[in-house]
C-alpha cells in the first residue's frame, strides 16, 4: 500500500501546468477526489482491534467558491478483516487560503461499522472534526497533511493523522 501511495504522490507532483493559487483551480472545477493514508494514534482497542493505519477515498463538491464551502463524502476501510469501516458526510470550509497553501477545517457525521474485541458487531454514529493543511502542487492537484478526530457515543474514538493527495475536475 505504501509503494502505491508513493507512486501516485510522485505522479501527481510531476504533472505539468502549475496553477498560481487555489483560486485559479476553483474557477475551473467544482468536483474533487482524494486518497488519504492515515496513522491512528488514539484508537480504542475494544473497537479497533489495535489498528495502526487506514486509508480513505473521498469525493467532494465545492458549492460556494467565495466562502470556500465544500461537501465531501468519504469511504474509509482498514486493511484488516475485523477493524471498523466508516461512511461519512462532512462540511468543509477554508479557514485560511494564501496562493498555493490553504487550511481546511471540517465537521461531519459518520456511520462506523465493525467488530469489538469480543467479536460482537456494532454500528454507531460518530462526530468527525478535522483540519488539513494543503499545498497546490500542480494545475489541479494538491497534497495535504490531515488531522481527524472521530468520537461516538458507545465509546468508539479515534484520532488520526495522515497525508492526502487529490485533484479537482
Where are these regions (language model features)?
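Short glycine/proline- and aromatic-enriched beta-strand/turn motifs that initiate or cap beta-hairpins
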Residues: 19-66, 72-75, 162, 166-168
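Active-site histidine-anchored catalytic micro-motif
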Residues: 131
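Gram-negative (and chloroplast) outer-membrane scaffold detector with strong preference
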Residues: 58-127, 135-141, 166-169
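Transmembrane beta-barrel architecture of outer-membrane proteins
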Residues: 30, 52-54, 84-88, 124-128, ...
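Extracytoplasmic loops and strand-loop junctions of Gram-negative outer membrane beta-barrel proteins
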Residues: 38-43, 112-115, 146-148
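Outer-membrane beta-barrel domain signature
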Residues: 22, 43-48, 76-82, 116-121, ...
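Signal peptide-directed secreted proteins
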Residues: 137-169
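Cleavable N-terminal export/targeting peptides
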Residues: 1-29
Amino acid at each position: 500500500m505504501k509503494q502505491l501511495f508513493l507512486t501516485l504522490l510522485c505522479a501527481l507532483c510531476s504533472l505539468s501546468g502549475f496553477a498560481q493559487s487555489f483560486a485559479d483551480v476553483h474557477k475551473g472545477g467544482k468536483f474533487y477526489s482524494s486518497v488519504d493514508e492515515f496513522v491512528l494514534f488514539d484508537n480504542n482497542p475494544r473497537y479497533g482491534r489495535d489498528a495502526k493505519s487506514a486509508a480513505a477515498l473521498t469525493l467532494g463538491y465545492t458549492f460556494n467558491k467565495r466562502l470556500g464551502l465544500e461537501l465531501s463524502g468519504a469511504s474509509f476501510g482498514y486493511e484488516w478483516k475485523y477493524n471498523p469501516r466508516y461512511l461519512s458526510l462532512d462540511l468543509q470550509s477554508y479557514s485560511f487560503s494564501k496562493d498555493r497553501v490553504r487550511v481546511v477545517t471540517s465537521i461531519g457525521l459518520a456511520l462506523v461499522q465493525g467488530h469489538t474485541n469480543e467479536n460482537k458487531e456494532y454500528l454507531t454514529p460518530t462526530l468527525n472534526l478535522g483540519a488539513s493543511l494543503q499545498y497546490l502542487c500542480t494545475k489541479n492537484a494538491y497534497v495535504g497533511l490531515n488531522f481527524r478526530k472521530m468520537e461516538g457515543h458507545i465509546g468508539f474514538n479515534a484520532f488520526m493523522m495522515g497525508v492526502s493527495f487529490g485533484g479537482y475536475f
